[in-house]
From Swiss-Prot:
It catalyses: N,N'-diacetylchitobiose(out) + N(pros)-phospho-L-histidyl-[protein] = diacetylchitobiose-6'-phosphate(in) + L-histidyl-[protein]. Its main location: cytoplasm. It is an enzyme of class 2 (transferase). Coiled coil: none annotated. The phosphoenolpyruvate-dependent sugar phosphotransferase system (sugar PTS), a major carbohydrate active transport system, catalyzes the phosphorylation of incoming sugar substrates concomitantly with their translocation across the cell membrane. The enzyme II ChbABC PTS system is involved in the transport of the chitin disaccharide N,N'-diacetylchitobiose (GlcNAc2). Also able to use N,N',N''-triacetyl chitotriose (GlcNAc3). The modification Phosphocysteine is found at residue 10. GO terms for biological process: N,N'-diacetylchitobiose import; phosphoenolpyruvate-dependent sugar phosphotransferase system. This is PTS system N,N'-diacetylchitobiose-specific EIIB component. The PTS EIIB type-3 domain is phosphorylated by phospho-EIIA on a cysteinyl residue. Then, it transfers the phosphoryl group to the sugar substrate concomitantly with the sugar uptake processed by the PTS EIIC type-3 domain. Gene3D superfamilies: 3.40.50.2300. The keyword Transmembrane helix does not apply. GO terms for cellular component: cytosol; transmembrane transporter complex. The gene is chbB. It is found in: Cytoplasm. It comes from Escherichia coli (strain K12).
């Protein structure tokens, strides 16, 4: 299976770095073929074009409509604040994979 790209965006690109590390560890553990990267929200329009799913940190949830407009053919979702706060790599990975599958079914 081709690797899917999961891109996380937050206000500076730094607050998601620990979450990305945990997601990568879970993806490796469960052999989920994904590439997971984090970027600042200012790069969402540019970098998001290459993503299979775009995840926004809860602190930029207000930007959801704007980023959906920039990336009309991509699934764009806000990371659940409880999962984000707990730095739950597996939970966020599962949500991202579900969003990719949902988009593929449509």
């Amino acid at each position: 299976m081709e690797k899917k790209h999961i891109y996380l965006f937050c206000s500076a690109g730094m607050s998601t770095s620990l979450l990305v590390s945990k997601m990568r560890a879970q993806a490796e553990k469960y052999e989920v073929p994904v590439i997971i990267e984090a970027f600042p929200e200012t790069l969402a329009g540019e970098k998001g074009q290459n993503a299979d799913v775009v995840l926004l940190g809860p602190q930029i949830a207000y930007m959801l409509p704007e980023i959906q407009r920039l990336l009309p053919n991509k699934p764009v979702e806000v990371i659940d604040s409880l999962l984000y706060g707990k730095v739950d790599g597996l939970g966020v990975l599962k949500a991202a994979v579900a969003a990719i599958k949902k988009a593929a079914a449509n």
